[in-house]
Amino acid sequence: MAEVAVGQASDLVPSEMDHEVIYSHLQGPLEGTIEPATPTEVVSNGAPLQPAPAELANSQGGAHVQPAPAEVVSSQDGLPTLQPLPPASIDLTEEVQPSEENMEVVNPGTSEEPSQGSGANPTAGAARSVSMNNFISGLQRLHNMLELLRPPPADHSVGPIRTRRRMAPILRARAGESQRQDNGRYVPHTPLYAYFQVSRSQPYPLPAAHDSETRNPPSGTDSDSDGSAEDEEVVVQAEEPEANIPEQGVIATDQEATSVTGDDAVPKESPQKPNMLSAMEDEEGETCTICLEQWTNAGDHRISALRCGHLFGFRCISKWLKGQTRKCPQCNKKAKHSDIVVIYARSLRALDTSEQERMKSDLLNEQMLRKQAELESAQCRLQLQVLIDKCTKLNSRVQDLEKFVVRHQNSAAQQCSRSKALCGKCLSSSQSPGKYSSEKTFTISQTGKCRILAYCDGLSCLVASQPSPQASFLPGFGVKMLSTANMKSSQYIPMHNKQIRGLSFSSQSKGLLLSASLDCTIKLTSLETNTVVQTYNTGRPVWSCCWCLDENNYVYAGLASGSILIYDLRNTNTYIQELVPQKARCPLVSLSYLPKAAVAAFPYGGVLAGTLENASFWELKSDFSHKPHVLSLEPGGFVDFQTESSTRHCLVTYRPDKSHNTVRTVLLEMSYKLDDAGEPVCSCLPVQTFLGGPTCKLLTKSAIFQSPENNGNVLVCTGDEASQSTLLWNAGSGLLLQNLKAGEPVLDICPFETNQNSYLATLTEKTVHMYKWE
């Protein structure tokens, strides 16, 4: 198809009369008229409009070939078929001189006369069709040239508007007109102004848009014959407010007008969509969720609410609750007809207060944090004031101490000289101590088997364990009472069936004696009435016993298995606690209680338990629980363990072994240190060692006590089997003070005071020796 220059456009403009004649010619029903098979595509950006000229063929005559880009073939059935037209492009840069071939002025009046006769020549009809097609092509080229001169639109923001129309009745009507029995000629039915239905605001597109926007949908002949309904989709560019788009009265086939700007297609969303969405959102708050109709502020469909707060029309919710489902349609909460509440309001809108609520929540959080910060600030100020006051007091105390040091600086030398004199006096007193002299000897048992001594300060009597003096009449073991007031022996008190291994008097109850025996019992005996007041069956042989000096209602019993049973005198049935050793299970040869004291060196109280192989200190807690502390002692055969409460010392006696040929008695100082958890760990440090004889066959007992001179010295008294005597040592210096002969191995030693005199009693298997301090 040739291009027409702008200067020649005026020659192609038809007159007004020509337009009217052509329009009437195209609109009139003609015999043999064929509907175009391909929809005409109108491109508003200036793309060429293809008018679809055809090659007309008859089944009885020859074909007349016309220079047209489309071909119309009539089959034997009489139904014409229009072949698709190839897309044509126009090159506006090439100048083409108009000629008779591409430009032909047709007189519509002369072309119409032969068409109305019955014997029309097919050749003349084809010539008229070609002339009409050439004329339409000229108009199309003129339209394209005018589009080049049109200025671009000012606003491209308005998108295309797509509308759909049902064209099935029109298509069926035209399909009936197009089917005729006689030969016909091709006459286009599309009105001329359909080619000019283009928006004036569309810019001229790039050449590349022609191929992408031009499409040929398949033929609609079959759809027309079947009579099916088809949708027509028309997309037109939204024009300016002053532009008017004429309505199409009759459209032969599906027509699609597409607005293209450049290479990219304009979106097909309607510019009114946001407004429509907002309108829909507004309607959602004004419609009943049951019938989806707007509620009213009066009548039977007025606004009503349930207890759950959801809104409905009164008629709808009343009918809903009268049915089987008596629940809210939205939240499914149970409801009844009496729950309906009518709301008297003209309109109801939900106010979005989420941001306001969030700001209120943030405000409350900030206020809470501010109050917390103010409280912390007040606490810090209070602590600061307390620290300032404390610092002021400490500064004043430091100043007082400085004054005190200056005031007593001159008297420091005098105090030093006094201390030296006191030390010399103590040294002289240790070099010349007092001595024990023999006071009296008591024969306790003719057969022997005496084991333990104990002194009762309240009754001023000394008791010694012995077998029954009348074994045939009253077998068993008991104690023999010795009066320290007149140094005379008293009566015998029977207690156990087997040998007694431990005796201990209560410091709170007068004359109450605790005894432990190998007959698996411990007993409480009142010396005031000479009767046994309480018996506890331990189930195992008992080797030692002692009282709890911090809680006088509790007693300890050391078993042959190494365990310690704790009894409460208020519970007469059984023991309340058992202390199981952590190491080897050996008989507890000694139990000695160390009371609590306000001493920095070792303030803790507990029981010192010694077996034949090791020793442990069971610390007494505030809840009367006991924490074990295994003492790290030198390995060897242990014989006896004793404690001294005022100096927090303990005394341990060892048998001879391979490393040591003699009996050793070691003085230990109790101490402690804190672990990582802040709990004390008890230990003992050796202070002095006292050596005895080379033999130790019996389980003898030793004693540690304060010096009768009350000079702060500590004395240690041990028995020596080899010399059959009692050895008295100075614990501070380690010197042997005295050797008291007994004639038999000494089994137990008991110091006591009575009538303002200090005595020392030693026990052998048969006798008791009394020594007085002078």
UniProtKB/Swiss-Prot annotation:
Lineage, broadest ranks: Eukaryota, Metazoa, Chordata, Craniata, Vertebrata
Alphabetical UniProt keywords: Coiled coil, Cytoplasm, DNA damage, DNA repair, Metal-binding, Nucleus, Phosphoprotein, Repeat, Transferase, Ubl conjugation pathway, WD repeat, Zinc, Zinc-finger
A biological process from GO: replication fork processing
ZnF (RING-type) intervals: 288-332
The organism of origin for this protein: Mus musculus (Mouse)
Gene3D superfamilies xref list: YVTN repeat-like/Quinoprotein amine dehydrogenase, Zinc/RING finger domain, C3HC4 (zinc finger)
Post-translational modification: Phosphorylated at Ser-59 and Ser-75 upon DNA damage by ATM or ATR. ATM phosphorylation occurs at early times upon DNA damage, while ATR is the major kinase at later times. Phosphorylation by ATM and ATR is required to stabilize p53/TP53. Part of the phosphorylation depends upon RPA2 presence.
Top-level taxon of origin: Eukaryota
Protein's UniProt name: E3 ubiquitin-protein ligase RFWD3
Main localization category: nucleus
